[in-house]
A protein has these predicted regions:
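Flexible loop/turn segments at secondary-structure boundaries
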Residues: 2-6, 30-34, 115-116, 122-123, ...
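Donor nucleotide-sugar binding/catalytic pocket of nucleotide-sugar-dependent glycosyltransferases
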Residues: 1-5, 12-30
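Extended, charge-enriched "interface" segments that sit outside catalytic cores
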Residues: 38-99
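Short His-Asn-centered micro-motif
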Residues: 148-149, 187-190, 208-211, 233-235
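Catalytic binding pocket for nucleotide-activated donors in carbohydrate/polymer assembly enzymes
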Residues: 18, 26-64, 201-202, 209-281
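Substrate-recognition/cap regions that form aromatic- and gly/pro-loop-enriched pockets
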Residues: 23, 139-140, 155-159, 163, ...
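Extended catalytic-interface subdomain
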Residues: 1-12, 272-281
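Long, K/E/R/D-enriched contiguous segments that form extended
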Residues: 82-196
Length: 281
């Protein structure tokens, strides 16, 4: 996708002169760190069912597929996931003094703070759910913990304003007794690789909701997928290749395509007011 965008739009003239200089290479991650080190419980579970050394050959993971509906395997996996969630809950309690329910769904938006990565969209989603619960306490039946982890560039004022908004939503939601046992918001402070190794294995839902056409690849989507989180995302970056690999039934895709977004920008056809008026909520 993004190789085509470079060739046909951004560097169209250069590509026509030097086509041999353009080569698309997708980002990648190492399962040695993001599985074997970060999620040792899952790593040891996988080793029980895989013949061979998965540290040397990641393709051996495909040997797990026959066990996807195996009750014993699923029970063991559920235990691993719960232990990881308890580990994260202990970490956030020690570092930030926030009590997190490990039995809740961990809905995680974890990446660099940028407008195109759309942490703001997730904020609006949380506010929408909050208002729904205020009107109808039975709207949420399974508790959800919305987790943000991000840093903004030093000079990126709007990104810092979004972080400020997240903190305001966190305070509003967490201090409202009507939200007890329903939803909670957590902003993870001082996010870094070491914290990611605790958070990513605990995630139930992976938010990969960048504006289609803006994310060159991304690696967080791969890390979360490797650790068993369900991906909600747009057809952008590596989400496209993940969807092709796991099948559309195993990833939750929404939103317009990169081409659709480009056309809206070019022809000035995007009107959020119309969407708002037709979906009063």
């Amino acid at each position: 996708l993004h190789a085509d965008i470079l060739k046909t739009r951004i560097f169209k003239g250069s590509y026509q002169i030097f086509p041999q200089k353009y080569l698309a290479i997708t980002n990648g991650i190492t399962h040695r760190r993001w599985l074997a080190l970060a999620n040792q419980g899952l790593y040891h579970l996988v080793r029980e069912y895989v013949k061979g050394d998965i540290l040397k050959d990641y393709r051996l993971f495909e040997q797990i597929l026959p066990y996807k509906d195996d009750k014993e395997f699923c029970k063991k996996y559920e235990k691993v996931k719960r232990n990881n969630k308890i580990r994260f809950a202990k970490y956030i309690k020690e570092k930030q003094g926030i009590e997190v329910n490990p039995e809740s769904i961990f809905d995680v938006h974890c990446k660099r703070l940028h407008e195109y990565k759309r942490q703001l969209l997730k904020c609006l989603h949380i506010i929408y759910i909050y208002q729904k619960i205020k009107k109808d306490p039975a709207y949420i039946t399974t508790p959800i913990t919305f987790i943000f982890a991000a840093k903004a560039a030093p000079g990126y004022a709007r990104a810092k304003e979004i972080i400020r908004l997240i903190h305001s939503i966190q305070e509003m939601v967490n201090k409202d007794p009507d939200m007890d046992g329903k939803i909670q918001v957590v902003f993870v402070e001082n996010y870094c690789v070491s914290v990611a190794e605790i958070l990513i294995p605990a995630a139930d839902i992976s938010e990969q909701i960048s504006t289609a056409g803006m994310e060159a690849s991304g690696t967080g989507n791969m890390k979360f997928m490797m650790n068993g989180a369900l991906t909600i995302g747009t057809m952008d970056g590596a989400n496209i290749e993940i969807a092709e690999r796991v099948g559309q039934e195993n990833i939750f895709i929404f939103g317009d395509s990169a081409e659709g977004n480009y056309n809206k920008k070019m022809y000035h056809t995007y009107n959020p007011g119309i969407i708002f008026e037709n979906h009063p909520g």
